Amino acid sequence: MACSMLNGVDKLALISGKTPNRLRFSGSDFTGSYKLPRLNLPPNSRNLRAKTLTTVTKCTLSASERPASQPRFIQNKQEAFWFYRFLSIVYDNIINPGHWTEDMRDVALEPADLNNRNMLVVDVGGGTGFTTLGIIKHVDPKNVTILDQSPHQLAKAKAKKPLKECRIIEGDAEDLPFPTDYADRYVSAGSIEYWPDPQRGIREAYRVLKLGGKACLIGPVYPTFWLSRFFADVWMLFPKEEEYIEWFQKAGFKDVQLKRIGPKWYRGVRRHGLIMGCSVTGVKPASGDSPLQLGPKVEDVQKPVHPLVFLYRFLLGALASTYYVLVPIYMWIKDKIFPKGMPL
């Protein structure tokens, strides 16, 4: 991967042990936070009993030479549409329990500062509404808009009684149907991995937020284990942590921060990756559009996909998704035999 993509941040602070109570990461072993180089780490407090390690990240080709801009299987909107037509049937009952639990959701949403029931919130890529259920704990449902490109996923959201007052619309995360300076909060969980152009989607997040508004993007992290890397590259976009930071910075966000998340029993968020592996936030410092100028969209959604090509890619994607369903099951069984914290 080109070094120019990784120059946005040069320090990573890893925190092990217990973290501040306000983060509600009680006893987590794999929590972490990114901060921009110009920011200082939070001062030690009575509640912070942790060891901090600062390392300098280096541009490397050892993880993968495949650029983030090269689309994987379900970074193609047409193919993702059909993929989710089937996945929506089992998404809440099979996918979420291993990758996106209620505890994870609530922890990941905390940095979004959903502290006012009257604030306007857009949930981009909201799908079945699982993340939205966490949002409406803090915000009046009538002030929340769920947007997704999959009508099949949105049908599941519409069927959820607590979401009846939410506005639910079909739309494109890279071309949002909201005016500039519209929302107080932008939330997107488990969606960036399907965007053909992640930078464009994050630029849109900046545009639709009001001055001082905050974006909270929750997504996967790129694995280090070779087999997990292979399936990640086949299936969908698993960004590196440095890439998240750079995308936010380029879009114009300030106070960009990243923290790792994962089920309490999951070992190896960085080794195997995780569909919901980190939460990234940034604040909009000025009104108006993003300072980042981009050319026209590259993806041609009108161009038909050859049936045989689609079938081949669909089968590869299905195999990769099966792998990422089985990894959490393996981790859960492993934790039952050797609880986390015990030597193997």
Swiss-Prot record:
Residues on Stromal side: 335-344
GO molecular function: 2-methyl-6-geranylgeranyl-1,4-benzoquinol methyltransferase activity; 2-methyl-6-phytyl-1,4-benzoquinone methyltransferase activity; 2-methyl-6-solanyl-1,4-benzoquinone methyltransferase activity
Pathway: Cofactor biosynthesis; tocopherol biosynthesis
Residue numbers spanned by region SAM motif II: 166-179
Subcellular location: Plastid, Chloroplast inner membrane
GO CC terms: chloroplast inner membrane
GO BP: any one term: methylation
The UniProt record lists the keyword Glycoprotein: no
Transmembrane segments: 314-334
Chloroplast intermembrane side: 63-313
Region (SAM motif I): 121-130
The keyword Transmembrane belongs to this UniProt entry's keyword annotation: yes
Membrane topology label: Single-pass membrane protein
Chain segments carrying region SAM motif III: 207-220
Pfam families in the cross-refs: Methyltransf_11
Transit peptide start and end: 1-62
Catalysed transformations (reactions): 2-methyl-6-phytyl-1,4-benzene-1,4-diol + S-adenosyl-L-methionine = 2,3-dimethyl-6-phytylbenzene-1,4-diol + S-adenosyl-L-homocysteine + H(+); 2-methyl-6-(all-trans-nonaprenyl)benzene-1,4-diol + S-adenosyl-L-methionine = plastoquinol-9 + S-adenosyl-L-homocysteine + H(+); 6-geranylgeranyl-2-methylbenzene-1,4-diol + S-adenosyl-L-methionine = 6-geranylgeranyl-2,3-dimethylbenzene-1,4-diol + S-adenosyl-L-homocysteine + H(+)
EC assignment: 2.1.1.295
First-listed, main subcellular location of the protein, grouped into a coarse class: plastid
Key words, A-Z: Chloroplast, Membrane, Methyltransferase, Plastid, Plastid inner membrane, S-adenosyl-L-methionine, Transferase, Transit peptide, Transmembrane, Transmembrane helix
Family: Belongs to the class I-like SAM-binding methyltransferase superfamily. MPBQ/MBSQ MT family.
Functional description taken from the UniProt entry: Involved in a key methylation step in both tocopherols (vitamin E) and plastoquinone synthesis. Catalyzes the conversion of 2-methyl-6-phytyl-1,4-hydroquinone (MPBQ) to 2,3-dimethyl-6-phytyl-1,4-hydroquinone (DMPQ, a substrate for tocopherol cyclase), and 2-methyl-6-solanyl-1,4-benzoquinone (MSBQ) to plastoquinone.
Protein's recorded name: 2-methyl-6-phytyl-1,4-hydroquinone methyltransferase, chloroplastic
